[in-house]
Amino acid sequence: MVRTRPTYIYLPDTAAGWPFPRTVNPYYEETKAESEAWISSLYPFDAYVQKKFNACDFTLLASMAYPWLSKDHIRTGADLMMLFFVFDEYSDVASVKDAQEMVDIVMDALRNPHKPRPKDENILGEIAKQFWERGVKTASAPSARRFVDYFEGYLKSVVEQAQDREHNRIRSIAEYFDVRRLTVGARPSYALMELGMNIPDEVWEDPAMEIMAVCVTDMIILDNDMLSWNVEQSRGDDAHNIVRIVMEANKTDVASAMKWVEDYHNLLKKTFLDVYNSVPSWGPEVDAQVQEYARGLGNWVICNISWSFESARYFGKEGRRIREERVVAILDKPVLVGVLESDA
């Protein structure tokens, strides 16, 4: 019997029952104007592509991810999202050699934010330099160190992803999570929540902190991959996506893979909330910072889901409708992705 290709997919409502509400930083509009003007002034894309890039509203992502940060710190968050997604557009089509060169440039800029960049260098160097030269001024020393370390881990994983792409490698589910926990960029993003904090190293080493971070990272992966799969599969670029990974590993169809995503998401949700409600105490001053950080982790889940539907990146102008109806037509012809995905 010939199995026909489905024409629609159902998107599970993974936000159902999540106790953290969608919240937007009060400095969103002001920061959006400043950050978009800044990235546009560096000309990472031509005018047409830059317009599409701005339509994705990465400042909204930052403003929902960091709703309680100060004006200076939310600007750092917005600029980080610009760096992330410009790098993503460049590296998604890069060879291993080119990806490694980009990584070396960006890391040199982050380690030496006051050093002028060579005029003939990839623009990523100047973007990273200006981002961190401004951001490090208002970051605590521990948070700055942790951010740079985590960002290096993210960059190295992108080279690993390029290697997979060159060799047409489809990972096992476990192998996929090993690299995806890095390529999703969650850890450096979490580090920005610490910009004004001074949480001792012994606290970071507590298992509860790691469990919460991993649970949220995995939920972000599941939601991001579930919501971006349709666009990615339409251009044959879904090898680095949990939906495709599960379909291959379990020899199943997209509907069953989506159900797998939903079930695992529910397990992660319960695990996170159990740990969140039983975090150890380290004294009033540290506890207040830990609570703020843990709340920020929980907020990242709803932030990621909300932005995915509200921006133009994955669903164009149809995001709000699709979020309500949960059904989307499977794309069956090549489309442009990333900043060129929609005409919104």
From Swiss-Prot:
Residues noted as binding (2E,6E)-farnesyl diphosphate in the record, renumbered to the chain: 313-314
Gene3D superfamilies: Farnesyl Diphosphate Synthase (1.10.600.10)
Motif (DDXXD motif): 88-92
GO biological process: isoprenoid biosynthetic process
Binding site for Mg(2+) 1: 88
Site (Plays a critical role in the stabilization of intermediate cation) location in chain: 85
The protein's Enzyme Commission number: 4.2.3.-
Cofactor(s) named in the record: Mg(2+)
Binding site for Mg(2+) 3: 224, 228, 232
One protein family per Pfam: Terpene_syn_C_2
GO molecular function ontology, one term from the record: metal ion binding
Residue interval(s) of motif NSE/DTE motif: 224-232
Keyword terms of this UniProt record: Lyase, Magnesium, Metal-binding
Annotated binding of Mg(2+) 2, by residue: 88
Family the UniProt entry places it in: Belongs to the terpene synthase family.
Main function: Terpene cyclase that catalyzes the cyclization of farnesyl diphosphate (FPP) to a single major sesquiterpene scaffold whose chemical structure is still unknown.
This protein's domain notes: The conserved DDXXD and NSE/DTE motifs are important for the catalytic activity, presumably through binding to Mg(2+).
Listed name of the protein: Sesquiterpene synthase 9
